[in-house]
Amino acid sequence: MNVLIVGCGKVGSFLAQVLESRGHDVSIVDKSASALDPANNVRLAGFSGLCVCGEPIDLDVLRSAGIESCDAVVAVTPSDNTNILVAQVATKIFGVQNVTARIYDPARQEVFAGQMAIHTICPTLLTVDTLLNTALKKEDE
């Protein structure tokens, strides 16, 4: 599978490492050159995929990262707005079917997932659910 990851922080770089170790072709876009530098991001040590530095919502940047031939796009920048824009561009302009955007704000996640039909993951909700389950489980014991 050919996967484009937008955002090369902890999640993006770790995801790239895991996908590449499983035999997938991976490209990464980040607006920070230092995030794409293995000297600054140890998870990229040995990474053989394409790294593109540029604004993730720039169509030319996305094209240079290979969005036109990718099977999946994952947007995991620190910005909900950037992630949702990348998801919309990937689906509407480039026709990518498998697109996921990380959204931190639970209220926004509901709007994007519901009204806009964009697949999202909300770490805030996942964390709260896990903590509640853990707390309630201990309460039941």
Where are these regions (language model features)?
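Cytosolic regulatory regions of ion transport systems
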Residues: 1-141
